Every structure is written in C-alpha cells, then in structure tokens.
Amino acid sequence: MQKATYYDNTAAALFGGYSSYPGSNGFGYDGPPQPPFQAATHLEGDYQRSACSLQSLGNAAPHAKSKELNGSCMRPGLAPEPLPAPPGSPPPSAAPTSTTSNSNNGGGPSKSGPPKCGAGSNSTLTKQIFPWMKESRQTSKLKNSSPGTAEGCGGGGGGGGGGGGGGGGSSGGGGGGGGGGDKSPPGSAASKRARTAYTSAQLVELEKEFHFNRYLCRPRRVEMANLLNLSERQIKIWFQNRRMKYKKDQKAKGLASSSGGPSPAGSPPQPMQSTAGFMNALHSMTPSYDSPSPPAFGKGHQNAYALPSNYQPPLKGCGAPQKYPPTPASEYEPHVLQANGGAYGTPTMQGSPVYVGGGGYADPLPPPAGPSLYGLNHLSHHPSGNLDYNGAAPMGPNQHHGPCDPHPTYTDLSSHHAPPQGRIQEAPKLTHL
C-alpha cells in the first residue's frame, strides 16, 4: 500500500508541474481552475513536495518530523491550509497520506482521489445544465419537423406558470403570425417552449372555427383539442393570435377605406348641390344662367302687361315655400313669377302645377276672379295644350313681342331644370303635357 501511494505521489509530484503549468495559462482542463498567483511557485513547490514525500516515505520519521515535513511542504503551496494538516498525532502511515492530500490540494491537477471527486462533481453539474439545454433545442427541432406533438418544455415541471405568462406575451405580440402558430416567449430559459408548427389540416379546422366564432368556449375548445391532437392551451393561444391578426387586418382595411374614401364620398355633394339649386340634367348649360337678362325680362313683362302692385303678394307667397337658397333660382324666380305668373296662370291650367320660366315649378296660382282682373282677356282663349314651355306661347295681337324676343334661350334652358326637392312629386305631370 505504501508502494502504491509512493508511486502515485511521486508521479503526481514529478508530473504535476507539467500538468498544472498549462492550467495556469488557461489551457489545462484536468481539474478545477487555479488562481494565477500560484503559477510561479508550481515548479519549486513540486520539487520540494517530491523531496518531502520521498523523505517521509523512506525514513518513516517520528510524528514531530512528519509535522515539520508537512509544514515545509505546505509553505510554498497554499498558505491558509496548514490547519487541517496536523490534526492530533496520526500514525506514521497516516502522515504521508495527509501530506499527499495536502500536496494534491495545493498543487491541484493530479489524478488522485479528492481532486478527481471535485472535478467529477463539477462535470456532473455541468452535465446537468448543458445537456438539458441541448435536449430542449433538439426537442424544438423535432417539434418543428414533426408537428402535432402537444408536449412542450413550458408545460413540464415548474415552467407551467412561466409558460402561462409566455402565452399572454405571445398573444399580445404574436398577432402577425396567427396563421402560423404560437410565438415562443422571449424571456426565461426555464420556460422556453418551442414554436408549434401546425399541419395544414389543423390550420383549416382552426380557421373554420374562427370564421364561425372568434371566441371559443371551453367545451368546444376541449373538443377541438381532442379532434386535432393539440392541447387546450395551444388552441387558446392560437385563437388569441388569430384575433390579433384579425384586428390588424380590420385596422388596415379601415385605413385603406378612409384614405380612398373622400373621392367617392365627396363626389355625391355635386349632384346634391345641383338638386338643391337647379336639378340640372345638362351641366354644360348652367353658365347661361349668369346673364343679367332675367330681371329685364321680368320688367319688360311688367310693363307689357301693366300688372298692378296688388298682384305681387300672392306671387310672393308662391315663391316663399322654396327653401333652397342658391342664388340663381332665388334671384330669378320672383321676377319671373311676377312676369309670367299671370301669362301662364290661365284658368285652364289651374288643375296642373304651373311652369314658371325662370326657376322651376310653382304651386298652382289661386284662381283669378276673372280674366279681366289683370287685363288678360287675350289669354283666356288659349287652351293649355297650346302652351309650350320654351317661352314661345301663342300670344294675342295686343301683346308686345319686344321684351320676349331676346330671351327664348333663357327660358329654353330653364325647361331642362327639374323642380326643387319640395316639388319633385309634381314633375311628372308636366312632362306629359
């Protein structure tokens, strides 16, 4: 036994310098790392240890000498460790083992018992950490290659709570990939779970279910999990991600419609303005209304027909119901009502709405007491069928044609105008006349 320890000790003492000196440079991997300040004392300490071990083994010295040898061996090595070296007075066979253990602890990288145990424990600890991480990566690769497996790292052990939190994070941030599967949470290594790759059949079923209702009740979720060979949690997270994606799509559609919206939505006000003002079917003829001739037209008729002033209040009453304020119609209508109201408002036309040359259709005029009230005897003989709405009504020989001649174009253009919205219901009656 002494020979075996002797050979081990001498080998450790002689070759310890060579095995531990690269360790100080960082290249040795036989044992635990050494502090750098021992690098200069390794060679001297190893030779002194070899001498100490040879002397102690060869001479079988008494206890005091072995204690001195222990102290001399420990001085170049680790300074704070001579206390456990001389406990009591061991027998001479125990002294060299204590020196060898101390020398091994001082020198470090040798192949005897205690350092090997320490290195083994460290290696087992590292093996407990690193291969576990390798396994998690391999399982993630396996999951990506073979989808449909429901077990993940986050579901096992103590990672359940962290996995739940990760599910919330994935539902918040992983909306873009809702069709593709779950997002792995960015955080803790303890609850790393792999991205679930769904098959096309699973995605079709999930999309179908999402199409019918976006929120899934728990019994239906359990049924879907059994049907698709997924876990409830995966289906829940898929639905969360899919809802986020749906919300994003709706936002994008809303922005697109609002950006393209003003052109179609802004175009209807143009016909609305035309209905409120003119109801013009031929937009190219609207500039003819800008001519200042209608007031002269009305005044000429006033002079020709010699309408008294008491005729104006009922005509103003007729013009009052028009609530639309566009300037051409409101400016021209009172004059034309004053001018043409008596001309076309003959008793033969009382049953139909009266067409007024300038501004559209007015209500039927109140029946006059007689044709002679306004001096319109010459118009009492004309039936309503002879009236055309181009301003060229058949006129009696007493009538002055002068003021009427320059303006047939104005009245012709006015015939294309439909009534204001208040009188729309009366329009078809006159179109058939």
From Swiss-Prot:
Residues 139-148 have a biased composition (Polar residues). It comes from the Eukaryota. Residues 79-94 have a biased composition (Pro residues). Residues 63-124, 136-195, 249-276, 389-433 are annotated as: Disordered. Keywords: Developmental protein, DNA-binding, Homeobox, Nucleus, Transcription, Transcription regulation. Pfam families: DUF4074, Homeodomain. Its main location: nucleus. The keyword Repeat does not apply. GO terms for molecular function: DNA-binding transcription activator activity, RNA polymerase II-specific; RNA polymerase II cis-regulatory region sequence-specific DNA binding. A motif (Antp-type hexapeptide) lies at residues 129-134. Residues 191-250 bind DNA. Disulfide bonds: none annotated. Residues 151-182 have a biased composition (Gly residues). GO terms for biological process: angiogenesis; anterior/posterior pattern specification; cartilage development; definitive hemopoiesis; embryonic skeletal system morphogenesis; face development; glossopharyngeal nerve morphogenesis; hematopoietic progenitor cell differentiation. One of its GO terms (cellular component) is nucleoplasm. It is found in: Nucleus. PANTHER family: HOMEOBOX PROTEIN HOX-B3, PROTEIN ZERKNUELLT 1-RELATED. Sequence-specific transcription factor which is part of a developmental regulatory system that provides cells with specific positional identities on the anterior-posterior axis. This is Homeobox protein Hox-B3. It comes from Mus musculus. The lineage of its organism: Eukaryota, Metazoa, Chordata, Craniata, Vertebrata.
